[in-house]
């Protein structure tokens, strides 16, 4: 009886979530109000087993988005595969480098920052990044500075820069993009696809340029309409790189993993 009740609750919660996302075409625009604490603690380990090295010290002033911890390297000078640079989410002053308990229960180092000063990005109009005039090497360096990681794998996250470096010299590269939810209980991918497709498309092109991909394959849910639904021409987005859009029947689970997409 208890197990049946849990299933009933989960199904109803899923139904409510689906209903909300269908009624509001772009719910992301509503999520604009946030709480800013006076002091924050940022762990130097963002992925289990990979602790970054702090590049700031107590008393330092930091800007919003400034790198405060860099990727640790092994004895041979190679970067840790799962690590990426850590940035300050707020402007302020570093009060101390201290030990803290991570969300996984382990102890480790962290940077404590007291909120102070003006924001660089929050609430400000962003400048357009002139990425089309960047070389693949410059784009990869920018990605490294941005601390971009790949969250596709459920088991662990990895540095996008290091993953790109591992495969960019291979031949006959096809870039496969999934624009639907791998897990139907988490609708983040589909929500972002509807609300931020132009930005996603730009990211796809940047990735293809870095990899020198000879084809882009975009997998999307069968009931979705892309790219016509967002009023964008494929040639405008991806230039001379051939693009193939493939419908995926998302009624069956799993359908969005690496193996399923390749099949």
Which ranges hold each PLM region?
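N-terminal, Lys/Arg-enriched amphipathic/low-complexity engagement segments
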Residues: 1-55, 70-73
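Generic structural motif
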Residues: 41-42, 46-50, 62-65, 74-96
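Acidic, glycine-anchored pre-beta loop/turn
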Residues: 56-62, 101-102
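Short, surface-exposed secondary-structure boundary micro-motifs
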Residues: 67, 73-74, 99, 116
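Hydrophobic or amphipathic alpha-helical targeting/insertion segments
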Residues: 84-121
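Phosphate/diphosphate-binding glycine-rich loops and adjacent basic-rich segments that engage nucleotide
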Residues: 120-156, 165-169, 174-180, 244-263
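Hydrophobic alpha-helical positions that pack around
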Residues: 153, 214-263
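Histidine-anchored nucleotide/phosphate-binding helix
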Residues: 194-210
């Amino acid at each position: 009886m208890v197990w049946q009740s849990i299933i009933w609750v989960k199904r109803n919660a899923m139904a409510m979530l689906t209903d909300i996302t269908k009624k509001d075409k772009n719910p992301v625009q509503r999520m604009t109000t946030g709480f800013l604490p006076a002091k924050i603690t940022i762990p130097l380990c963002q992925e289990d087993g990979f602790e970054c090295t702090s590049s700031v010290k107590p008393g330092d002033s930091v800007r919003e988005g400034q790198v405060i911890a860099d990727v640790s390297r092994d004895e041979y000078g190679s970067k840790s595969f799962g690590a990426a640079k850590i940035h300050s989410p707020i402007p302020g002053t570093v009060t101390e480098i201290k030990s803290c308990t991570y969300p996984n229960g382990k102890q480790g180092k962290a940077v404590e920052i007291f909120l102070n000063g003006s924001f660089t990005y929050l609430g400000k109009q962003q400048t357009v990044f002139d990425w089309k005039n960047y070389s693949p090497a410059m784009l990869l360096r920018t990605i490294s500075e941005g601390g971009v990681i790949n969250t596709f794998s459920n088991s662990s996250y990895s540095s996008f820069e290091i993953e790109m470096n591992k495969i960019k010299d291979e031949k006959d590269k096809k870039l496969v993009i999934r624009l639907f939810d791998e897990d139907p209980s988490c609708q983040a991918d589909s929500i972002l696809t509807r609300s931020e497709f132009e930005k996603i498309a730009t990211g796809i092109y940047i990735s293809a340029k870095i990899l020198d991909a000879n084809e882009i394959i975009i997998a999307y849910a069968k009931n979705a309409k892309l790219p016509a639904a967002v009023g964008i021409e494929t040639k405008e987005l991806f230039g001379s790189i051939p693009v193939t859009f493939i419908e995926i029947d998302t009624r069956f689970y799993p359908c969005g993993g690496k193996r399923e997409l390749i099949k």
